[in-house]
From Swiss-Prot:
SUPFAM superfamilies per the UniProt record, alphabetical: Carboxypeptidase regulatory domain-like
Known function: Part of the ecpRABCDE operon, which encodes the E.coli common pilus (ECP). ECP is found in both commensal and pathogenic strains and plays a dual role in early-stage biofilm development and host cell recognition.
Signal peptide range: 1-29
Name the UniProt record assigns to this protein: Probable outer membrane usher protein EcpC
Family, per entry: Belongs to the EcpC/MatD family.
Induction details: Negatively regulated by H-NS. Positively regulated by IHF and EcpR.
A Pfam family assignment: TcfC
InterPro entries: CarboxyPept-like_regulatory, Pilus_assem_C, Pilus_assem_E-set-like_dom
Amino acid sequence: MPLRRFSPGLKAQFAFGMVFLFVQPDASAADISAQQIGGVIIPQAFSQALQDGMSVPLYIHLAGSQGRQDDQRIGSAFIWLDDGQLRIRKIQLEESEDNASVSEQTRQQLMTLANAPFNEALTIPLTDNAQLDLSLRQLLLQLVVKREALGTVLRSRSEDIGQSSVNTLSSNLSYNFGVYNNQLRNGGSNTSSYLSLNNVTALREHHVVLDGSLYGIGSGQQDSELYKAMYERDFAGHRFAGGMLDTWNLQSLGPMTAISAGKIYGLSWGNQASSTIFDSSQSATPVIAFLPAAGEVHLTRDGRLLSVQNFTMGNHEVDTRGLPYGIYDVEVEVIVNGRVISKRTQRVNKLFSRGRGVGAPLAWQIWGGSFHMDRWSENGKKTRPAKESWLAGASTSGSLSTFSWAATGYGYDNQAVGETRLTLPLGGAINVNLQNMLASDSSWSNIASISATLPGGFSSLWVNQEKTRIGNQLRRSDADNRAIGGTLNLNSLWSKLGTFSISYNDDRRYNSHYYTADYYQSVYSGTFGSLGLRAGIQRYNNGDSSANTGKYIALDLSLPLGNWFSAGMTHQNGYTMANLSARKQFDEGTIRTVGANLSRAISGDTGDDKTLSGGAYAQFDARYASGTLNVNSAADGYINTNLTANGSVGWQGKNIAASGRTDGNAGVIFDTGLENDGQISAKINGRIFPLNGKRNYLPLSPYGRYEVELQNSKNSLDSYDIVSGRKSHLTLYPGNVAVIEPEVKQMVTVSGRIRAEDGTLLANARINNHIGRTRTDENGEFVMDVDKKYPTIDFRYSGNKTCEVALELNQARGAVWVGDVVCSGLSSWAAVTQTGEENES
């Protein structure tokens, strides 16, 4: 039956009739035209409204609860009166993260209700644990449920980041530059250099990636190499890539170790996508708490409070992102109105895992194309020429509880290869990793590793082993090595002891092995800094050569304000050296770190080596580049100098800016228009970044959501009023460069004394500027905020006459006293006051 609009007259009758809903008249007083439903007298006007149909709110109510203060709205219901029978036409549920959830059975019953009638008590039974109760007096519908009918509000393990916020063409260019110079003992030298460029140009979620390098710039042996040229679209949980790819862009799920060096021209498609974010920081086993009313949940471990969280009525999964990793029990305590309602023990299962995390759907990728294999050689014994081949394969990965796995199957050069990777945590103390490869030319490989934390938590142990045998087709070398190591935290046994670490590596293919042993102990930590002791020994043996043993001992002193100093001795190559090192760090400025080291032989035969060696370095962070300058004189007499620098350039339309940061291949250009060295700050997802001058570029990681807020800098004397563009919400894909153009006014608090042209003071005068007004005192003195872009003050008098003060604020910052200033255009203040007029703007 269609819903008709109420006429004004009908609305008045309806409002009048509603009075009768709250008064139960006796039978003699009842209107003969009224109708009784569920013990409530329904006036004729309201009955007509019910026949037309109306929408009422739907609330969930826990059976046994007193009152409705903890009820939650979960939707609405459309009710109507059909031949004296009140019915529900349909129910519309409203999803909300904060609402209680109903079980799937109850949800299905609600969604399938169609023209269901209420009984005489205005109730519709749904299941043994849920029913609908209608209150005509309050005009609301309650879903009354027992605890068994409640579902559980689980936390989402995945989320799509959505559409890009940048709808125009934009680009990010990252650059990395390096220069190396080696000065030989005989006076000769050689220099090499490189420039690596990575460009990502994007239109919304579509982007093209170009990655290459130039070598030997400025020399006669200049060369260039293009490593990647591909189109990619990663959106809504699926990714497509095509072009010249590397193995990581071809697939990133399973191991792929049997591919030799070369170039791949192909395509890749799958659901291994960065546009869908999987949260692996929650416990694999959800921690669930039931609250009969709104209250708190406390998580406690070994008597220590780990978390306090607030929930509404219902079954809720507790947020475990902030809890420590591991497998352990926590006590879950539910508190309502200050009373402990329930207390139970549940297990937290949080382990570091590869891939998407527990509960994620099966990940897959299919890929293939043309493979240009480079020439290959193994120690000059086996060589293979460059060759063209086809390439096709598929990858997949998944998890089951804490067990995770990945597999890759592919073929090229008429060979079939299968590879797997398995990860299995055993309890909270042992982790097992296995990686295997098998090829049709009888090649095989096995890599196994086990790590364990021993009881007591003061020691750990790890074991690795790799065995590889290659047939007559794959371009890869045999391998046979094993390693074992461990760490013993003696501090757990006695607070005055330190940490001891040992490792042993044996490469049986090359008949080489080495072991290391290191000890570190904190000697002092207090107000004046910290002092630590380091000592260790290494022993190497390569093939049939004699063993080489090195030893060292050092004291490390860390002082406040970023100072660090180390002194010690090392013994290697048959002689002992004394070593000194120092480092200073700076929080601000272009130079962020400077350091130096000096070594001198004090005993033993140095042979051809020099007795004195050392070096110095500096790390810089400039506006357009950051990097390191290092100069080192080694014991062999060579002097090595190298400079590395990197940065990024962002572009969108007419906006282009550069940065010394390389945080990602997306970013934001801030066009603030600040003059000279003006500075404000950008707060991005809680982190503070300084913005200097008119334009800044800030690279950011792609596939991310960002909340950007502009604010005054605590390191600047200037004060700014950010009129518009203060807050922005951005979603960035690779190559997306957003532009934020806020309206920023640089404010200066100006104080002074204003006079007319004849020197008389403008006492008690209303003066104005671009952004506000104020009144001078009886001495003509004033204080007001002025926008530096409009450094004028004006005074209006005699109707439409104006005088003006031009302020010199170019060098002003924060607050300034300008002294006596003249309002040009006003000959005398006395002439204004004699007229007795009220002056105002």
